[in-house]
Amino acid sequence: MIRRIGVLTSGGDAPGMNAAIRGVVRAALSEGLEIYGIYDGYQGLYEDRMEQLDRYSVSDVINRGGTFLGSARFPQFRDEAVRQVCVENMQRRGLDALVVIGGDGSYMGAKRLTEMGFPCIGLPGTIDNDVAGTDYTIGYFTALETVLEAIDRLRDTSSSHQRISIVEVMGRHCGDLTLAAAIAGGCEFIVLPEVPFSPEDLVSEIKAGIEKGKKHAIVAITELVCDVDELAKYIEKETGRETRSTVLGHIQRGGSPVAYDRILASRMGAYSIELLQQGYGGRCVGIQNEKMVHHDIVDAIENMKRPFKGDWLETAKKLF
């Protein structure tokens, strides 16, 4: 029987993580369970930095970005001896289960703890929207609004100077954030990690737009596809149009979460407690067709793939 639960946030922060912690804490307390907050992710778990939380511990956090528990990348967690210390710390504290909020790297940590016999539930907290088994991740919609606002501002100045602007968006190997922001922001060109990219082809498309009378343009590109500064130089050289690159960077991770992220995080947090009380462990929570779902965390990491929104891209091409 589950009586005492730990909760931590891990990896890159995302708006809505605080709302998720709140959902876990309030739902656990409503069921008569004890809940412990673990500071700075798996590193804090290894260092035994945790404390008991009550309902007032999560007052006034639902509207705050970031995570009040803190987060840290802890590559040493790959070492089985380090994980064993973590398990021993939780056992000594009397914890029966752990809720982990983070991305796929955080899920991998939860998977390894589950394999060591300690039940974990994973909640998808990342702006990248790249976690399998869920339509959306906590923080994605807030980041989308942040990127869209930046694109709108770039369009103002790009149109004033008849300039080509390249905006680099986070997402790693997933183009969801870039694609959605590009459609919403009316970007003329989209470069995604899921689609083969050629600078020469992009320049040809830009030249075609110029020949049709296009005075300015915005290129939305997912990080890691290429060096955007070098791409800007190449486009300017080939087109004769002033071209500037803007890397949005970590500003995309900050800010007060939008309503949907707060609701999603709250629902997922509460659902994780339901699953633990039903005897589940080694699961990850998702939302599909607006319903809460759960999957085997090993299956989600190793076998499940996020479908590429090819139909969205085809729509975008028709609009630009």
Swiss-Prot record:
ATP binds at G12, R73, F74, G103, D104, G105, S106. Substrate binds at T126, I127, D128, R163, M170, G171, R172, E223, R244, H250, I251, Q252, R253. Its main location: cytoplasm. Mg(2+) binds at D104. It catalyses: beta-D-fructose 6-phosphate + ATP = beta-D-fructose 1,6-bisphosphate + ADP + H(+). Disulfide bonds: none annotated. Its EC number is 2.7.1.11. It is found in: Cytoplasm. It comes from the Bacteria. Coiled coil: none annotated. SUPFAM superfamilies: Phosphofructokinase. CDD domains: Bacterial_PFK (cd00763). GO terms for cellular component: 6-phosphofructokinase complex. GO terms for molecular function: 6-phosphofructokinase activity; AMP binding; ATP binding; fructose-6-phosphate binding; identical protein binding; metal ion binding; monosaccharide binding. Keywords: Allosteric enzyme, ATP-binding, Cytoplasm, Glycolysis, Kinase, Magnesium, Metal-binding, Nucleotide-binding, Transferase. The active site is at D128. HAMAP family: Phosphofructokinase_I_B1. PANTHER family: ATP-DEPENDENT 6-PHOSPHOFRUCTOKINASE, PHOSPHOFRUCTOKINASE. NCBIfam families: PFKA_ATP, PRK03202.1. Catalyzes the phosphorylation of D-fructose 6-phosphate to fructose 1,6-bisphosphate by ATP, the first committing step of glycolysis. Belongs to the phosphofructokinase type A (PFKA) family. ATP-dependent PFK group I subfamily. Prokaryotic clade 'B1' sub-subfamily. This is ATP-dependent 6-phosphofructokinase. It comes from Pectobacterium atrosepticum (strain SCRI 1043 / ATCC BAA-672) (Erwinia carotovora subsp. atroseptica).
